[in-house]
Swiss-Prot record:
Annotated protein name in UniProt: Lysophospholipid acyltransferase
Catalytic activity: a 1-acyl-sn-glycero-3-phosphate + an acyl-CoA = a 1,2-diacyl-sn-glycero-3-phosphate + CoA; a 1-acyl-sn-glycero-3-phosphocholine + an acyl-CoA = a 1,2-diacyl-sn-glycero-3-phosphocholine + CoA; a 1-acyl-sn-glycero-3-phosphoethanolamine + an acyl-CoA = a 1,2-diacyl-sn-glycero-3-phosphoethanolamine + CoA
Family indicated by similarity: Belongs to the membrane-bound acyltransferase family.
Subcellular location: Endoplasmic reticulum membrane; Microsome membrane
Species for this entry: Schizosaccharomyces pombe (strain 972 / ATCC 24843) (Fission yeast)
Bilayer topology annotation: Multi-pass membrane protein
Residues spanning the membrane: 15-35, 56-76, 95-115, 224-244, 247-267, 411-431, 442-462
Matches recorded under Pfam families: MBOAT
Main location: endoplasmic reticulum
Gene Ontology terms: cellular component: endoplasmic reticulum; endoplasmic reticulum membrane; membrane
InterPro entries per record: LPLAT_7/PORCN-like, MBOAT_fam
Length: 509
Protein backbone atom coordinates (compact mmCIF):
# COMPACT_ATOMS: atom_id res chain seq x y z
CA UNK A 1 0.00 0.00 0.00
CA UNK A 2 2.90 2.31 0.74
CA UNK A 3 3.88 2.13 -2.91
CA UNK A 4 0.38 2.17 -4.39
CA UNK A 5 -0.44 5.44 -2.66
CA UNK A 6 2.48 7.12 -4.46
CA UNK A 7 1.07 6.46 -7.95
CA UNK A 8 -1.45 9.36 -8.13
CA UNK A 9 1.05 11.81 -6.62
CA UNK A 10 3.73 10.84 -9.15
CA UNK A 11 1.23 11.10 -12.01
CA UNK A 12 0.02 14.58 -11.10
CA UNK A 13 3.59 15.59 -10.29
CA UNK A 14 4.70 14.97 -13.88
CA UNK A 15 1.54 16.63 -15.16
CA UNK A 16 1.78 19.78 -13.01
CA UNK A 17 5.56 20.04 -12.72
CA UNK A 18 5.40 19.95 -8.92
CA UNK A 19 7.43 17.69 -6.61
CA UNK A 20 5.34 14.68 -5.41
CA UNK A 21 6.01 15.49 -1.75
CA UNK A 22 4.45 18.93 -2.18
CA UNK A 23 1.31 17.29 -3.51
CA UNK A 24 1.38 14.85 -0.59
CA UNK A 25 1.56 17.75 1.84
CA UNK A 26 -1.43 19.40 0.14
CA UNK A 27 -3.29 16.08 0.31
CA UNK A 28 -2.66 15.90 4.06
CA UNK A 29 -3.87 19.49 4.52
CA UNK A 30 -7.11 18.85 2.63
CA UNK A 31 -7.84 15.32 3.88
CA UNK A 32 -7.50 16.58 7.45
CA UNK A 33 -10.88 18.32 6.96
CA UNK A 34 -13.03 15.18 6.53
CA UNK A 35 -10.97 13.38 9.19
CA UNK A 36 -11.54 16.33 11.54
CA UNK A 37 -15.26 16.11 10.83
CA UNK A 38 -15.21 12.42 11.77
CA UNK A 39 -13.23 13.13 14.96
CA UNK A 40 -15.83 15.68 15.97
CA UNK A 41 -18.63 13.13 15.62
CA UNK A 42 -16.96 10.18 17.33
CA UNK A 43 -18.34 8.96 20.67
CA UNK A 44 -17.28 11.19 23.53
CA UNK A 45 -15.07 8.50 25.14
CA UNK A 46 -11.59 10.10 25.18
CA UNK A 47 -9.76 6.83 24.45
CA UNK A 48 -11.63 6.48 21.14
CA UNK A 49 -10.87 10.06 20.13
CA UNK A 50 -7.22 9.72 21.16
CA UNK A 51 -6.75 6.49 19.19
CA UNK A 52 -8.36 8.03 16.11
CA UNK A 53 -6.09 11.09 16.32
CA UNK A 54 -2.97 8.91 16.70
CA UNK A 55 -4.02 6.61 13.83
CA UNK A 56 -4.52 9.44 11.34
CA UNK A 57 -1.27 11.09 12.42
CA UNK A 58 0.65 7.84 11.85
CA UNK A 59 -1.13 7.39 8.50
CA UNK A 60 0.19 10.77 7.36
CA UNK A 61 3.74 10.07 8.54
CA UNK A 62 4.06 6.42 7.48
CA UNK A 63 1.34 5.74 4.93
CA UNK A 64 1.69 8.97 2.94
CA UNK A 65 5.24 10.22 3.56
CA UNK A 66 6.93 6.89 4.50
CA UNK A 67 8.75 8.52 7.42
CA UNK A 68 9.38 5.33 9.41
CA UNK A 69 12.56 6.69 11.01
CA UNK A 70 10.79 10.01 11.55
CA UNK A 71 8.13 8.36 13.70
CA UNK A 72 10.89 6.89 15.87
CA UNK A 73 12.40 10.38 16.22
CA UNK A 74 9.09 11.82 17.42
CA UNK A 75 8.52 8.88 19.77
CA UNK A 76 11.98 9.29 21.30
CA UNK A 77 11.39 12.99 21.98
CA UNK A 78 7.90 12.33 23.32
CA UNK A 79 8.77 9.44 25.64
CA UNK A 80 11.94 11.13 26.89
CA UNK A 81 9.91 14.20 27.83
CA UNK A 82 7.09 12.18 29.37
CA UNK A 83 9.23 10.05 31.68
CA UNK A 84 11.71 12.78 32.67
CA UNK A 85 8.82 15.13 33.51
CA UNK A 86 7.07 12.37 35.46
CA UNK A 87 9.98 11.10 37.57
CA UNK A 88 12.58 13.90 37.79
CA UNK A 89 11.17 16.32 40.35
CA UNK A 90 13.76 19.08 40.14
CA UNK A 91 13.81 22.75 39.18
CA UNK A 92 16.26 21.72 36.45
CA UNK A 93 13.75 19.36 34.84
CA UNK A 94 12.21 21.78 32.31
CA UNK A 95 15.64 23.14 31.36
CA UNK A 96 17.04 19.64 30.78
CA UNK A 97 14.07 18.73 28.59
CA UNK A 98 14.31 22.05 26.76
CA UNK A 99 18.03 21.60 26.01
CA UNK A 100 17.71 17.95 24.93
CA UNK A 101 14.62 18.45 22.74
CA UNK A 102 15.87 21.67 21.14
CA UNK A 103 19.31 20.10 20.68
CA UNK A 104 17.78 17.03 19.02
CA UNK A 105 15.73 19.26 16.71
CA UNK A 106 18.84 21.25 15.87
CA UNK A 107 20.76 18.04 15.09
CA UNK A 108 18.04 17.09 12.60
CA UNK A 109 18.54 20.47 10.95
CA UNK A 110 22.29 19.80 10.77
CA UNK A 111 21.71 16.44 9.06
CA UNK A 112 19.33 18.03 6.57
CA UNK A 113 21.89 20.80 5.94
CA UNK A 114 24.66 18.28 5.25
CA UNK A 115 22.44 16.00 3.15
CA UNK A 116 19.95 18.35 1.44
CA UNK A 117 16.90 16.83 -0.24
CA UNK A 118 13.64 17.98 -1.77
CA UNK A 119 11.82 15.11 -0.09
CA UNK A 120 9.75 15.79 3.01
CA UNK A 121 11.55 14.80 6.19
CA UNK A 122 10.60 14.81 9.85
CA UNK A 123 12.16 18.16 10.80
CA UNK A 124 8.98 20.23 10.34
CA UNK A 125 6.96 17.89 12.57
CA UNK A 126 9.86 17.75 15.03
CA UNK A 127 9.88 21.56 15.21
CA UNK A 128 6.17 21.58 16.08
CA UNK A 129 6.68 18.83 18.65
CA UNK A 130 9.65 20.69 20.17
CA UNK A 131 7.32 23.54 21.12
CA UNK A 132 4.66 21.21 22.49
CA UNK A 133 7.04 19.10 24.57
CA UNK A 134 9.02 21.97 26.09
CA UNK A 135 5.76 23.73 26.97
CA UNK A 136 4.52 20.46 28.51
CA UNK A 137 7.65 20.26 30.68
CA UNK A 138 7.12 23.78 32.02
CA UNK A 139 3.43 23.04 32.66
CA UNK A 140 4.38 19.99 34.75
CA UNK A 141 6.98 22.05 36.63
CA UNK A 142 4.46 24.83 37.31
CA UNK A 143 1.98 22.24 38.56
CA UNK A 144 4.39 21.36 41.37
CA UNK A 145 4.69 24.95 42.58
CA UNK A 146 2.35 26.82 44.95
CA UNK A 147 -0.26 28.85 43.08
CA UNK A 148 1.02 32.00 44.80
CA UNK A 149 4.26 31.74 42.81
CA UNK A 150 2.54 31.50 39.43
CA UNK A 151 1.15 34.09 37.07
CA UNK A 152 -2.48 33.80 35.98
CA UNK A 153 -1.33 32.34 32.65
CA UNK A 154 0.87 29.76 34.39
CA UNK A 155 -1.95 28.76 36.74
CA UNK A 156 -4.21 28.08 33.78
CA UNK A 157 -1.53 26.03 31.98
CA UNK A 158 -0.19 24.15 35.03
CA UNK A 159 -0.55 20.36 35.20
CA UNK A 160 -1.12 19.11 38.74
CA UNK A 161 -0.70 15.48 37.68
CA UNK A 162 0.98 13.63 34.81
CA UNK A 163 -1.61 12.70 32.16
CA UNK A 164 -2.37 9.21 30.92
CA UNK A 165 0.13 8.06 28.25
CA UNK A 166 -2.67 7.62 25.68
CA UNK A 167 -3.77 11.24 26.18
CA UNK A 168 -0.16 12.35 25.85
CA UNK A 169 0.43 10.45 22.58
CA UNK A 170 -2.86 11.78 21.25
CA UNK A 171 -1.47 15.25 21.92
CA UNK A 172 1.83 14.36 20.24
CA UNK A 173 0.28 12.93 17.06
CA UNK A 174 -2.77 15.23 16.79
CA UNK A 175 -3.15 15.09 13.01
CA UNK A 176 -4.56 18.54 12.03
CA UNK A 177 -1.42 20.24 13.35
CA UNK A 178 1.13 17.42 13.08
CA UNK A 179 2.97 18.53 9.94
CA UNK A 180 3.26 22.33 10.13
CA UNK A 181 1.52 23.29 13.35
CA UNK A 182 0.03 25.15 15.02
CA UNK A 183 1.48 24.13 18.37
CA UNK A 184 -0.56 24.55 21.56
CA UNK A 185 -0.37 23.62 25.23
CA UNK A 186 -1.35 20.21 26.54
CA UNK A 187 -4.19 21.61 28.66
CA UNK A 188 -5.91 22.82 25.49
CA UNK A 189 -5.75 19.33 24.01
CA UNK A 190 -7.04 17.67 27.18
CA UNK A 191 -9.95 20.10 27.47
CA UNK A 192 -10.74 19.44 23.83
CA UNK A 193 -10.45 15.64 23.86
CA UNK A 194 -12.56 15.35 27.03
CA UNK A 195 -15.01 17.95 25.66
CA UNK A 196 -14.71 19.97 28.88
CA UNK A 197 -14.05 23.18 26.92
CA UNK A 198 -17.58 22.84 25.50
CA UNK A 199 -19.40 22.04 28.76
CA UNK A 200 -20.93 25.54 29.14
CA UNK A 201 -22.60 24.99 25.75
CA UNK A 202 -24.06 21.59 26.67
CA UNK A 203 -27.72 21.15 25.83
CA UNK A 204 -29.40 18.12 27.48
CA UNK A 205 -31.69 17.75 24.45
CA UNK A 206 -28.88 17.64 21.88
CA UNK A 207 -26.35 14.86 21.38
CA UNK A 208 -23.61 17.15 20.04
CA UNK A 209 -22.28 19.78 22.43
CA UNK A 210 -19.54 21.15 20.18
CA UNK A 211 -20.65 24.21 18.21
CA UNK A 212 -20.98 23.97 14.44
CA UNK A 213 -17.74 25.04 12.78
CA UNK A 214 -18.04 24.05 9.12
CA UNK A 215 -18.49 27.60 7.83
CA UNK A 216 -15.44 29.18 9.54
CA UNK A 217 -13.36 26.08 8.71
CA UNK A 218 -14.19 26.27 5.01
CA UNK A 219 -13.43 29.99 5.08
CA UNK A 220 -9.90 29.23 6.29
CA UNK A 221 -9.60 26.49 3.67
CA UNK A 222 -10.51 28.75 0.74
CA UNK A 223 -8.24 31.51 2.00
CA UNK A 224 -5.39 29.05 2.40
CA UNK A 225 -5.79 27.74 -1.14
CA UNK A 226 -5.99 31.29 -2.49
CA UNK A 227 -2.75 32.25 -0.73
CA UNK A 228 -0.99 29.20 -2.18
CA UNK A 229 -2.22 30.01 -5.70
CA UNK A 230 -1.01 33.60 -5.30
CA UNK A 231 2.34 32.30 -4.02
CA UNK A 232 2.83 29.99 -7.01
CA UNK A 233 1.90 32.80 -9.41
CA UNK A 234 3.85 35.53 -7.62
CA UNK A 235 7.05 33.54 -7.14
CA UNK A 236 7.29 33.01 -10.90
CA UNK A 237 6.95 36.77 -11.50
CA UNK A 238 9.15 37.89 -8.60
CA UNK A 239 11.75 35.12 -8.15
CA UNK A 240 13.96 35.37 -5.09
CA UNK A 241 17.15 34.76 -7.06
CA UNK A 242 16.60 37.97 -9.04
CA UNK A 243 18.08 39.75 -6.01
CA UNK A 244 21.45 38.21 -6.92
CA UNK A 245 21.46 39.34 -10.56
CA UNK A 246 23.40 42.25 -12.13
CA UNK A 247 20.07 43.77 -13.21
CA UNK A 248 19.00 44.13 -9.59
CA UNK A 249 22.40 45.54 -8.65
CA UNK A 250 22.13 48.24 -11.33
CA UNK A 251 18.61 49.32 -10.30
CA UNK A 252 17.94 52.59 -8.40
CA UNK A 253 17.85 52.21 -4.62
CA UNK A 254 14.09 52.90 -4.34
CA UNK A 255 13.36 50.27 -6.98
CA UNK A 256 15.58 47.80 -5.11
CA UNK A 257 13.65 48.29 -1.88
CA UNK A 258 10.36 48.03 -3.74
CA UNK A 259 11.39 44.70 -5.25
CA UNK A 260 12.62 43.44 -1.88
CA UNK A 261 9.27 44.29 -0.25
CA UNK A 262 7.29 42.55 -3.00
CA UNK A 263 9.56 39.49 -2.97
CA UNK A 264 9.27 39.17 0.81
CA UNK A 265 5.48 39.53 0.59
CA UNK A 266 5.25 36.79 -2.05
CA UNK A 267 7.40 34.50 0.13
CA UNK A 268 5.08 35.08 3.10
CA UNK A 269 2.10 33.88 1.04
CA UNK A 270 3.35 30.29 1.32
CA UNK A 271 3.20 30.49 5.11
CA UNK A 272 -0.17 32.23 5.04
CA UNK A 273 -1.56 29.40 2.91
CA UNK A 274 -0.19 26.52 4.98
CA UNK A 275 -1.22 28.04 8.31
CA UNK A 276 -4.72 28.98 7.13
CA UNK A 277 -5.29 25.42 5.88
CA UNK A 278 -4.11 23.79 9.11
CA UNK A 279 -6.08 26.30 11.19
CA UNK A 280 -9.23 25.39 9.27
CA UNK A 281 -8.81 21.69 10.07
CA UNK A 282 -8.26 22.54 13.74
CA UNK A 283 -11.45 24.61 13.71
CA UNK A 284 -13.45 21.80 12.12
CA UNK A 285 -12.19 19.32 14.72
CA UNK A 286 -13.29 21.70 17.48
CA UNK A 287 -9.96 22.50 19.12
CA UNK A 288 -10.00 25.99 17.61
CA UNK A 289 -12.99 26.92 19.79
CA UNK A 290 -12.17 29.81 22.14
CA UNK A 291 -15.38 30.65 23.93
CA UNK A 292 -18.06 33.13 22.95
CA UNK A 293 -17.67 36.73 21.86
CA UNK A 294 -19.75 39.65 23.18
CA UNK A 295 -22.54 38.70 20.75
CA UNK A 296 -22.63 35.12 22.09
CA UNK A 297 -21.17 33.78 18.85
CA UNK A 298 -18.38 31.15 18.97
CA UNK A 299 -14.82 32.39 18.57
CA UNK A 300 -12.48 30.15 16.57
CA UNK A 301 -9.09 31.67 17.27
CA UNK A 302 -7.66 29.46 20.04
CA UNK A 303 -4.88 28.07 17.81
CA UNK A 304 -4.89 30.78 15.15
CA UNK A 305 -1.35 31.15 13.83
CA UNK A 306 -1.43 34.10 11.46
CA UNK A 307 -3.27 37.36 10.84
CA UNK A 308 -2.10 38.53 7.39
CA UNK A 309 -3.90 41.89 7.50
CA UNK A 310 -2.52 42.86 10.91
CA UNK A 311 0.97 41.77 9.91
CA UNK A 312 1.06 43.57 6.57
CA UNK A 313 -0.31 46.82 8.01
CA UNK A 314 1.41 46.78 11.41
CA UNK A 315 2.72 50.22 12.41
CA UNK A 316 5.42 48.84 14.72
CA UNK A 317 7.60 45.75 15.11
CA UNK A 318 5.75 44.53 18.20
CA UNK A 319 2.37 44.40 16.44
CA UNK A 320 3.92 42.72 13.40
CA UNK A 321 5.56 39.97 15.44
CA UNK A 322 2.36 39.38 17.41
CA UNK A 323 0.48 38.73 14.15
CA UNK A 324 3.08 36.36 12.64
CA UNK A 325 3.45 32.68 13.60
CA UNK A 326 1.43 33.57 16.67
CA UNK A 327 1.65 30.27 18.52
CA UNK A 328 5.42 30.11 18.09
CA UNK A 329 5.61 33.63 19.49
CA UNK A 330 3.49 32.57 22.47
CA UNK A 331 5.88 29.67 23.04
CA UNK A 332 8.93 31.91 22.79
CA UNK A 333 7.41 34.49 25.11
CA UNK A 334 6.04 32.17 27.81
CA UNK A 335 8.70 29.46 27.77
CA UNK A 336 11.88 31.34 26.79
CA UNK A 337 11.62 35.12 27.17
CA UNK A 338 9.90 35.13 30.57
CA UNK A 339 11.71 32.02 31.86
CA UNK A 340 15.22 33.37 31.17
CA UNK A 341 14.56 36.48 33.29
CA UNK A 342 15.18 36.13 37.02
CA UNK A 343 12.09 35.97 39.21
CA UNK A 344 10.89 39.40 40.24
CA UNK A 345 12.81 41.19 37.48
CA UNK A 346 11.54 42.47 34.17
CA UNK A 347 12.94 40.77 31.06
CA UNK A 348 15.64 42.84 29.38
CA UNK A 349 17.96 42.62 26.41
CA UNK A 350 19.36 39.30 27.68
CA UNK A 351 15.89 37.75 27.43
CA UNK A 352 15.35 39.32 24.01
CA UNK A 353 18.65 38.04 22.61
CA UNK A 354 18.14 34.58 24.15
CA UNK A 355 14.68 34.40 22.61
CA UNK A 356 15.86 35.28 19.11
CA UNK A 357 18.82 32.88 19.43
CA UNK A 358 16.51 30.01 20.42
CA UNK A 359 14.22 30.97 17.54
CA UNK A 360 17.14 30.79 15.11
CA UNK A 361 18.28 27.38 16.42
CA UNK A 362 14.71 26.11 16.27
CA UNK A 363 14.44 27.19 12.61
CA UNK A 364 17.67 25.56 11.47
CA UNK A 365 21.43 25.71 11.04
CA UNK A 366 21.72 28.01 8.02
CA UNK A 367 23.51 31.31 8.60
CA UNK A 368 20.57 33.25 7.19
CA UNK A 369 18.41 32.40 10.19
CA UNK A 370 20.97 33.81 12.61
CA UNK A 371 21.47 36.96 10.55
CA UNK A 372 17.72 37.55 10.60
CA UNK A 373 16.97 36.79 14.23
CA UNK A 374 20.00 38.43 15.83
CA UNK A 375 19.35 41.56 13.74
CA UNK A 376 15.67 41.36 14.71
CA UNK A 377 16.63 41.34 18.39
CA UNK A 378 18.40 44.67 17.97
CA UNK A 379 15.69 46.24 15.83
CA UNK A 380 13.04 45.20 18.36
CA UNK A 381 15.09 46.92 21.06
CA UNK A 382 15.21 50.06 18.91
CA UNK A 383 11.45 49.82 18.43
CA UNK A 384 10.96 49.66 22.22
CA UNK A 385 13.12 52.74 22.70
CA UNK A 386 11.19 54.58 19.99
CA UNK A 387 7.83 53.71 21.48
CA UNK A 388 8.95 54.72 24.96
CA UNK A 389 10.88 57.92 24.20
CA UNK A 390 9.52 59.26 20.88
CA UNK A 391 5.89 58.15 20.58
CA UNK A 392 4.73 60.24 23.61
CA UNK A 393 5.48 63.44 21.65
CA UNK A 394 2.77 62.42 19.17
CA UNK A 395 0.20 62.02 21.96
CA UNK A 396 -1.53 64.71 23.96
CA UNK A 397 -0.16 65.32 27.48
CA UNK A 398 -2.59 62.80 28.96
CA UNK A 399 -0.51 60.17 27.10
CA UNK A 400 -3.67 58.52 25.78
CA UNK A 401 -5.34 60.84 23.28
CA UNK A 402 -3.70 60.94 19.81
CA UNK A 403 -2.11 64.27 18.93
CA UNK A 404 -2.59 66.09 15.61
CA UNK A 405 0.39 64.28 14.03
CA UNK A 406 -0.22 60.82 15.48
CA UNK A 407 -1.56 59.55 12.16
CA UNK A 408 1.62 60.72 10.44
CA UNK A 409 3.66 58.86 13.08
CA UNK A 410 1.59 55.69 12.46
CA UNK A 411 2.01 55.87 8.67
CA UNK A 412 5.76 56.38 8.98
CA UNK A 413 5.86 53.50 11.46
CA UNK A 414 3.96 51.21 9.09
CA UNK A 415 6.29 51.97 6.17
CA UNK A 416 9.41 51.66 8.35
CA UNK A 417 8.18 48.36 9.84
CA UNK A 418 7.44 46.83 6.45
CA UNK A 419 10.75 47.99 4.98
CA UNK A 420 12.76 46.80 7.99
CA UNK A 421 11.14 43.37 8.14
CA UNK A 422 11.39 42.85 4.38
CA UNK A 423 15.07 43.78 4.56
CA UNK A 424 15.73 41.34 7.43
CA UNK A 425 13.61 38.53 5.96
CA UNK A 426 15.84 38.35 2.88
CA UNK A 427 18.55 36.47 4.78
CA UNK A 428 15.84 34.16 6.20
CA UNK A 429 14.83 33.31 2.62
CA UNK A 430 18.26 33.11 1.00
CA UNK A 431 19.78 31.24 3.99
CA UNK A 432 23.27 31.50 2.50
CA UNK A 433 25.66 33.84 4.35
CA UNK A 434 27.45 35.18 1.29
CA UNK A 435 24.25 35.77 -0.68
CA UNK A 436 22.54 37.49 2.26
CA UNK A 437 25.45 39.87 2.84
CA UNK A 438 25.58 40.55 -0.91
CA UNK A 439 21.93 41.64 -1.05
CA UNK A 440 22.24 43.75 2.10
CA UNK A 441 25.30 45.38 0.58
CA UNK A 442 23.25 46.26 -2.51
CA UNK A 443 20.75 47.86 -0.12
CA UNK A 444 23.62 49.82 1.51
CA UNK A 445 23.02 48.16 4.90
CA UNK A 446 20.54 50.97 5.56
CA UNK A 447 18.54 49.13 8.23
CA UNK A 448 21.66 48.02 10.10
CA UNK A 449 23.08 51.55 9.97
CA UNK A 450 19.80 52.88 11.33
CA UNK A 451 19.96 50.33 14.18
CA UNK A 452 23.49 51.44 15.13
CA UNK A 453 22.60 55.14 15.03
CA UNK A 454 19.37 54.64 16.99
CA UNK A 455 21.09 52.56 19.68
CA UNK A 456 23.81 55.20 20.00
CA UNK A 457 21.22 57.99 20.33
CA UNK A 458 19.02 56.17 22.84
CA UNK A 459 22.03 55.28 24.98
CA UNK A 460 23.29 58.86 25.09
CA UNK A 461 22.25 61.94 27.13
CA UNK A 462 19.64 62.59 24.44
CA UNK A 463 17.42 59.92 25.99
CA UNK A 464 17.41 61.74 29.35
CA UNK A 465 16.52 65.00 27.63
CA UNK A 466 13.62 63.34 25.84
CA UNK A 467 12.40 61.80 29.11
CA UNK A 468 12.61 65.16 30.90
CA UNK A 469 10.55 66.84 28.19
CA UNK A 470 7.94 64.08 28.35
CA UNK A 471 7.83 64.29 32.15
CA UNK A 472 7.50 68.07 31.99
CA UNK A 473 4.54 67.82 29.60
CA UNK A 474 2.82 65.24 31.78
CA UNK A 475 3.40 67.15 35.02
CA UNK A 476 2.18 70.42 33.51
CA UNK A 477 -0.94 68.64 32.34
CA UNK A 478 -1.53 67.13 35.79
CA UNK A 479 -1.03 70.47 37.51
CA UNK A 480 -3.34 72.22 35.06
CA UNK A 481 -5.98 69.51 35.52
CA UNK A 482 -5.68 69.84 39.29
CA UNK A 483 -6.06 73.63 39.19
CA UNK A 484 -9.12 73.31 36.96
CA UNK A 485 -10.66 70.77 39.33
CA UNK A 486 -10.04 73.18 42.24
CA UNK A 487 -11.96 75.91 40.47
CA UNK A 488 -14.98 73.64 40.20
CA UNK A 489 -14.77 72.51 43.84
CA UNK A 490 -16.82 74.25 46.55
CA UNK A 491 -15.09 76.15 49.36
CA UNK A 492 -16.39 73.64 51.92
CA UNK A 493 -14.86 70.74 50.00
CA UNK A 494 -11.56 72.61 49.69
CA UNK A 495 -11.29 72.97 53.48
CA UNK A 496 -11.38 69.19 53.78
CA UNK A 497 -8.69 68.58 51.16
CA UNK A 498 -4.92 68.58 51.50
CA UNK A 499 -3.52 70.71 48.72
CA UNK A 500 -0.50 69.17 47.03
CA UNK A 501 2.55 71.25 46.32
CA UNK A 502 4.03 71.90 42.91
CA UNK A 503 6.98 69.67 43.86
CA UNK A 504 4.60 66.71 44.08
CA UNK A 505 4.04 66.95 40.36
CA UNK A 506 7.65 67.63 39.50
CA UNK A 507 8.75 64.49 41.37
CA UNK A 508 6.01 62.35 39.89
CA UNK A 509 7.38 59.33 38.07
Amino acid sequence: MAYLIDIPFEYFSSFLGVHPDQLKLLFCFLSAYPFAGILKRLPSAPWIRNLFSISIGLFYLIGVHHLYDGVLVLLFDALFTYFVAAFYRSSRMPWIIFIVILGHTFSSHVIRYIYPSENTDITASQMVLCMKLTAFAWSVYDGRLPSSELSSYQKDRALRKIPNILYFLGYVFFFPSLLVGPAFDYVDYERFITLSMFKPLADPYEKQITPHSLEPALGRCWRGLLWLILFITGSSIYPLKFLLTPKFASSPILLKYGYVCITAFVARMKYYGAWELSDGACILSGIGYNGLDSSKHPRWDRVKNIDPIKFEFADNIKCALEAWNMNTNKWLRNYVYLRVAKKGKRPGFKSTLSTFTVSAMWHGVSAGYYLTFVSAAFIQTVAKYTRRHVRPFFLKPDMETPGPFKRVYDVIGMVATNLSLSYLIISFLLLNLKESIHVWKELYFIVHIYILIALAVFNSPIRSKLDNKIRSRVNSYKLKSYEQSMKSTSDTDMLNMSVPKREDFENDE
